[in-house]
Amino acid sequence: TQLPDVPMMARIPLSQARLCDAVVDRPSSLSARAVNQLAQALLPPGITGRAVLVAPAAPGDFQTDLAVAIARAAAQNGRRVVLIDGNFRNPRVAHAIGVTNQKGLVAALTGRLRLSQCFFRDTRSAAIMLACTQGLPNPSQILASPAMAQLVAHLRGVCDLVVIDSGPVLATNDAAQLARLSDVTLLVCNRAPRETIAQAMRELGGTAAQVALVSMELPRAA
């Protein structure tokens, strides 16, 4: 299958350590250095207010681990970062960073709580998180709502980087909805077949301002 002309923005070597922890615990590792280079490419010096969507081509492609790692790497470099869990059907950010948060993004979008009441600080960096800890009956409707667009626009105005974690591109149109709100969509691929990657690119092509590939590479067996 011929892949569309989309740049490969990064190749991230994976190891036994979780990527989101490696950027903190093992900053000189190949994985951490690759994430830092990616974070710097996404947010060059002097640039602020960028929104980046991290979406997998297929389930199990480590996108949440990468989203948390990018947020932590940028925060360690002194940037103001917010990470949004936009995977309403299968939220993973809170679990990935080891917290239990009962407020979350949905309460802010529906007006039940002020936005400031829904933020919580990452346990291992200065990044701020907006988690989604509950299943929703109508996630696509909420993601496409004016409230979601206004939230992302507001955060872009006060932060250097907004990272949005998303579910698989081909499962629903959720990722495509979030791509409309983002400057760059990182399409994360690991073991997805080329046809799946090509189909995901086509799905994003009509909505995303820019799409770039990130390959998560498992170590090869000896």
For the regions a language model picked out, list residue spans one by one.
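Gly/Ser-rich helix-loop-strand patches that form or flank binding pockets
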Residues: 3-8, 174-188
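Short boundary/hinge segments that flank catalytic cores
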Residues: 1-68, 72-80, 86-106, 116, ...
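Conserved Switch II/interswitch segment of TRAFAC-class P-loop GTPases
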Residues: 165, 169-171, 182-198
